């Protein structure tokens, strides 16, 4: 049995700090074999840079997934080209920098496939079909390992749920990112795929999805353009732990994780 820790969108320095504080102890105390972190907001709230990625890897990440905001920092273009552990959604054009899949070998010697796709409903830019892309990439990954974890970076709950059912029995786990709000629907689907619509965010607790709450409230009240700033203060780490049978690739358990911390 292997255990994978899946961490929702890391938001800026508060998110990175709480990852650094708790992920090493979680790995040790719970016997975590693999850590997957969505990094698309990890650099000052938007995008990722080489130094930020390195910080997350040193804190215990094995692979970094992303989404539509991964392109916000120009440094990410070279990072995606050079580091196969940093993923962009696989359903971007083939000549976009980087890759949407990776195969990670755990310390215990098991290989796990990671796939990152982006939804199309209410999302920009428009990408290729995540369903067809996922089916194609999974067929290729299964030639190496039956254990596959999919990060679906999408806005619409319905699209993520539909992808979960579409991939049931084909992958070990489908988990959602992007909305920064965790859902309470973790379950194992009938054919053995663990599913969670959204893992939430890892970032400032007293915020509106990572942004200073006063700015967002003012925006709603005045309906005028605002340049948002990332919040600070206490932070929360949100995600899930999934257990997978290495021989079959089927999930045997999934549970949500939420840890609060302060002093960041």
What residues fall within each predicted segment?
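Acidic, metal/ion-coordinating pockets
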Residues: 1-264
């Amino acid at each position: 049995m292997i255990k994978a820790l899946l961490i929702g969108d890391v938001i800026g320095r508060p998110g990175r700090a709480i990852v650094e504080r708790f992920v090493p102890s979680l790995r040790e105390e719970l016997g975590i074999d693999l850590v997957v972190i969505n990094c698309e907001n990890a650099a000052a709230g938007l995008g990722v840079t080489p130094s930020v990625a390195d910080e997350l890897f040193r804190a215990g990440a094995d692979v970094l997934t992303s989404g539509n905001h991964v392109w916000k920092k120009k440094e990410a273009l070279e990072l995606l080209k050079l580091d196969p552990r940093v993923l962009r959604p696989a359903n971007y054009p083939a000549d976009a920098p980087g890759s949407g899949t990776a195969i990670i070998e755990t310390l215990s010697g098991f290989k796990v496939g990671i796939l990152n796709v982006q939804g199309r409903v209410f999302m920009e830019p428009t990408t290729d079909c995540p369903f067809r892309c996922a089916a194609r990439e999974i067929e290729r990954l299964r030639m190496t390992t039956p254990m596959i974890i999919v990060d679906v970076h999408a806005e619409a709950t319905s699209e993520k749920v539909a992808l979960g059912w579409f991939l049931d029995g084909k992958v070990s786990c489908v988990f959602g990112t992007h909305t920064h709000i965790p859902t309470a629907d973790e379950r194992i689907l009938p054919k053995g795929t663990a599913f969670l619509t959204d893992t939430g965010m890892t970032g400032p607790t007293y915020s509106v999805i990572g942004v200073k709450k006063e700015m967002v409230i003012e925006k709603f009240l005045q309906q005028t353009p605002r340049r948002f700033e990332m919040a600070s203060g206490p932070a929360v780490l949100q995600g899930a732990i999934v257990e997978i049978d290495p021989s079959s690739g089927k999930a045997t358990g999934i549970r949500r994780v939420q840890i609060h911390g302060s002093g960041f």
